[in-house]
Amino acid sequence: TPEYFTLSFIGDCTLAPHQNTQDYFNKVGDDYAYPFANTVQYFADDEYTFANLECTFSDRSLSPVGYPTFYFRAPTSYVNILLEGGVDFVTTANNHLNDFGDKGAEDTYATLDNAGLPYGKVGQAQVVTTKNGIKIGVYCGFNINDGYFVPTTDECVNAINQMKADGAEYIVMAFHWGKELYYKPTQKMIDLAQACIDAGADLIYGTHPHVLGP
């Protein structure tokens, strides 16, 4: 294990096109390197880069499920944006994975599998290996606006113990949580994070609020 190494963490990546950004798409075309052109140098030089994939990948004409205010679907070719950008792992544990129901989620997983891009699902404990052979445990969970958290605290602690047993040298807990536009963590977030750290997690990777937090 190196004396020190760098992990990079990207926030919510919504790759789906929007009418207000159509001019950019018309100009950029299929230049998948464009979105991360100014940051790829950092991600290429680090040990491992994580991102939250806040959209579905599908080429099917699917209808939104439920009544989301926003729903995001990107063509499957847009997975190349992540690959060209130096992303090594994405979490899909968020409130937009199921914007287009089970079929949208299935297409998303298939797209990531075909691209060879590792990903995490809700409640999935796994150990990934970085380019220099470091074993990092990753566990993903989420809630919406500080509501019911999936998985539970006990399940998070059990997952940490399992990842240790599976050889993880460092453990990252990737949580899509909290309230949008709130700068400070809620007490629920603090309590869960502390329980995870006490159990042996090394880092809490939080996404969702759309603002920087402590």
Task: Outline where the language-model segments fall.
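Acidic, metal/ion-coordinating pockets
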Residues: T1-P214
